[in-house]
Swiss-Prot record:
One of its GO terms (molecular function) is thioredoxin peroxidase activity. The active site is at residue 58. Residues 16-162 form the Thioredoxin domain. This is Thiol peroxidase. Homodimer. Belongs to the peroxiredoxin family. Tpx subfamily. Disulfide bonds join 58-92. Thiol-specific peroxidase that catalyzes the reduction of hydrogen peroxide and organic hydroperoxides to water and alcohols, respectively. Plays a role in cell protection against oxidative stress by detoxifying peroxides. Gene3D superfamilies: Glutaredoxin. The active site is a conserved redox-active cysteine residue, the peroxidatic cysteine (C(P)), which makes the nucleophilic attack on the peroxide substrate. The peroxide oxidizes the C(P)-SH to cysteine sulfenic acid (C(P)-SOH), which then reacts with another cysteine residue, the resolving cysteine (C(R)), to form a disulfide bridge. The disulfide is subsequently reduced by an appropriate electron donor to complete the catalytic cycle. In this atypical 2-Cys peroxiredoxin, C(R) is present in the same subunit to form an intramolecular disulfide. InterPro entries: Redoxin, Thioredoxin-like_sf, Thioredoxin_domain, TPX, Tpx_CS, Tpx_Peroxidase_subfamily. It comes from Streptococcus gordonii. Keywords: Antioxidant, Disulfide bond, Oxidoreductase, Peroxidase, Redox-active center.
Length: 163
């Protein structure tokens, strides 16, 4: 059972598992351009999915993955939330993180539904980490049961480094 703020929450759709092919998406970047999975073709991808960049745990998660994985060759960390692109950009500027890929599902929540992370009761995204290989195959998946807690950074980072 997944909880948010101590309460059970529900989702629509089926969570991706190791071996699944990731769904394409169309998300809004901080410059308001549209980004799809194809924009990151040929790269290893870490989808760091968070409820809101303006919370402590989400901020920590975003900072940690970007700090620890930004130097890996052929790897991109993609942070996804339903925050407005302006808020995502403001956070990056305040944190001094210049090369973070921040994408927003604010417009139609299609990413949240397709990846089964849209919290029905709150219309926020649940906390999850998905590692995709260069062919968009899921090689690591963690859907955090208590959304108010951090993911298993070490396991996710090891999964990327082992690709």
């Amino acid at each position: 059972m997944t909880t948010f703020l101590g309460n059970p929450v529900t989702f629509t759709g089926k969570q991706l598992q190791v071996g699944d092919t990731a769904h394409d998406f169309s998300l809004t970047a901080t410059d308001l351009s549209k980004k799809t999975l194809a924009d990151f073709a040929g790269k290893k991808k870490v989808l760091s999915i968070i409820p809101s960049i303006d919370t402590g745990v989400c901020s920590t998660q975003t900072r940690r993955f970007n700090q620890e994985l930004s130097d890996l060759d052929n790897t991109v960390v993609i942070t996804v939330s339903v925050d407005l692109p302006f808020a995502q950009g403001k956070w990056c500027a305040a944190e001094g993180i210049e090369n973070a890929v921040m994408l927003s599902d604010y417009f139609d929540h299609s990413f949240g539904r397709d990846y089964a992370v849209l919290i029905n009761e709150w219309h926020l995204l649940a906390r999850a980490v998905l590692v995709l290989d260069e062919n968009n195959t899921v090689t690591y998946a963690e859907y955090v049961d208590n959304i108010n807690t951090e993911p298993d950074y070490d396991a996710a980072i090891a999964a990327v480094k082992n690709l």
